Amino acid sequence: MPTIKAIATLANQHAITDLKVLLFTLDLWNSPAPTVYVFSDLMSAPLIRAIPYSGKVHIKKDALNAYTGLNRIDMESRRGRLFATLFADFTAEKTHLMRWALETEPDGVLFCDADICHLAPLPTIPDGTDLALSPHMIRKSDTDKYGVYNAGYLWFKNPELATKWLDLCETSRFFEQGCLEDLATNRNLYEFPVQVNYGWWRLWQGVQPPVVLEEEWGIFREEGSSGITVQKQPLQSIHTHWSEKSDRATSEFNKWVLSQLTRLSSSKTKKTAALVRFLSKI
């Protein structure tokens, strides 16, 4: 199965802290580290350049100039150029980013939101896959609103999929995300398993109660991953803002994950110990 060698992400100044975690954890678990493609703005590009990373980082410095200094609340209050709000425009930049990255990465690119924290090496993609998506694995009432798949973690290698994705954004029920199930129609689709891109929503909005889902988490100490398991398999990545303090769902999820990592922080799990030290400074 093909390995992932290229990552793409969006980052303005409000995502710098998240991006530090993304790059640190990509470096921690992958050798060599994947090449990273970033859409950013002129103000944020120097901040990104200053983040330590052993792999190559390509930055399109003016791609997000229209969003310089703006957070999600700011963007949602402004009219967009293409869509109803500037935030809808911003999320659709993912389609342009993927097309740009694929110009030099014909074997495929994994898009990651900047707030992805890797806890193990990158997953592999099965041969013959056209599109790899991450299901939310949440209640149907929530997928009806937000989409079956999460737009913060996906892979493809055909640039035409980026164009189709942008077209579908025009009628999507939730920004660039609610249309992903339509993008998957008539494609050779691979769905990432539960251990990949695990967000707070999977724990708090799951079909089963949180107490049942928490029981799926376990510990298996080994140097090849953080040592956290879900359904007895290594947890590959989580989707969270580590610096978030005001949003309760995110904050409680962070405490839950960090408590597991801290239990694993020992001489037998050196990389996990390094990760805990890094996260404690966020």
PLM regions: where:
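GT-A fold catalytic core of metal-dependent nucleotide-sugar glycosyltransferases
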Residues: D89-D144, V148, F156
